[in-house]
Design a protein with these regions (language model features):
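Conserved Ser/Thr-centered positions that define the repeating blades of beta-propeller domains
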Residues: 1, 66-67, 136, 140, ...
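Blade-level signature of beta-propeller repeat domains, shared across WD40, Kelch, NHL, RCC1
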Residues: 257-302
Length: 401
């Protein structure tokens, strides 16, 4: 019910870091490389096998692990996956001399031993790795028979960072966020028949778009991307359009196109909740922004965010070819504010007079880092003066170009 939570330590192998350990897998003894660093052993995803009472974790360099949550000891155990050159891995038939669970890059190790995503349902488990996706069928004793798929078997990319089921009346479509390489445009992949055949969707890839997540509203498939939110008819998934996002009712904007998640909430009136690099945004069913929610300390009369301002930082407070900085100031009486920005020689760079009220107590003015001639300003410290009801307030802003 979410009212209480239990904590379990991160999966960590016993043994010498960089060395090898042996582990038992249903009567067979297999070899595994040891990882101890928390960075390489980070957990990216979890799944619950309710029928057999296991929780699975994908741990990058630490591999795929699981524990039985009804067992008092709650000890993590490694779960072997096929090596890169293996199409399958069958219980009781693993070559103990040849098999090596090793997440080092080839030729010494296997990309398929670096898991990112996991999804479990009924008697099947899917595990996405840097080397494709693995479909596992549970045996009655808890062992798993694996089939390994990669680009040679029809995927759009081998780096599977997300596995998202879409339910239809007669079947389940399984979507894969199938990257080709980190932070690069890529296709999407799906199967309607449990992996017998795969369909690659290339439109977003051809437009140079990176997809971070997929989700579903009543009528649409939603793709959260580095170019905003794209949507496709719930029964399609081939043709995609960009969702226009307006300023909210106060005029405040989301200053990024990096959308990492989109969740449909509400019953009578559907609302899409967007997780972005610039806060949480609520979008109505007719695509009007209702509110933008952020967490920051109340403005101390006058401040700038972010500071320092990386004017060309990709993905952060970037829209189009411009970066943006917010000037926040306390304004409970809704006075109209004016900001003058001066360089280190105290020459005025630009005057800003476009305030927006962001709540009952604060207002903001947004600047794109350009001077009155439209040129991006140079590196340096800038002095910013707020004029509010015949009073002056000062703050400093560091700009890194």
């Amino acid at each position: 019910d979410g009212l209480s939570w239990h904590y379990i330590q991160q999966p960590v192998d016993e043994g010498v870091p960089g060395g090898d350990i042996n582990f038992d897998w249903f009567g067979q003894t297999l070899k595994k490389k040891v990882w101890h660093t928390t960075v390489d052993n980070v957990s990216y995803d979890v799944a619950v096998d309710i029928k057999r009472k296991y929780i699975y974790s994908t741990n990058w360099g630490g591999g795929l692990t699981r524990f039985n949550y009804e067992n008092g000891s709650k000890q993590w155990e490694p779960v072997p996956l096929p090596m890169d050159d293996q199409d399958s891995l069958i219980c009781g038939e693993i070559d103990e001399e040849e098999y090596y669970f090793n997440p080092i890059d080839p030729p010494d190790g296997s990309y398929n031993h670096k898991p990112f995503s996991v999804y479990a349902v009924a008697d099947t488990i899917w595990v996405g790795t840097a080397g494709g996706i693995n479909k596992g069928i549970f045996r009655s004793d808890g062992c798993i028979n694996w089939t390994h798929y990669n680009m040679e078997k029809g995927l759009g990319g081998d780096w599977v960072i997300g596995i998202i089921p879409q339910q239809f009346d007669e079947y389940t479509r399984l979507w894969l966020i199938s990257w080709i390489s980190p932070n690069a445009p890529h296709p999407l992949t799906y199967t309607n028949d449990g992996g017998q055949t795969w369909k690659v969707v290339n439109q977003l890839f051809n437009q140079g778009i990176i997809v971070y997540n997929l989700s579903f509203s009543r009528d649409y498939i939603l793709a959260s991307t580095d170019h905003g939110v794209y949507f496709s008819d719930i029964n399609d998934g081939i043709f995609w359009m960009k969702m226009p996002i307006t300023s909210d009712q106060t005029g405040e904007k989301i200053l990024t196109e990096n959308i990492y998640s989109a969740i449909s909430i509400g019953n009578a009136e559907e609302i899409i909740m967007l997780g972005t690099a610039d806060g949480l945004s609520l979008i109505s069913s007719d695509r009007v922004t209702l509110d933008n929610i952020r967490f920051w300390e109340p403005a101390s009369l006058f401040s700038a965010y972010p500071n320092p301002f990386f004017i060309n930082h990709e993905g952060y407070n970037q829209v189009g070819n411009d970066g943006y900085v917010r000037f926040l100031y306390s304004n409970p009486n809704y006075f109209s504010g004016l900001i003058d920005i001066f360089d280190f020689a105290m020459d005025r760079v630009i005057q800003l007079n476009n305030p927006q009220s962001i709540n009952n107590y604060e207002s903001e003015i947004i600047w794109n880092g350009r001077n009155e001639s439209g040129d991006k300003v140079a590196n340096g410290v800038y002095f910013c003066r707020l004029s509010l009801k015949n009073q002056y307030y000062w703050t400093k802003l560091a700009v890194i170009n």
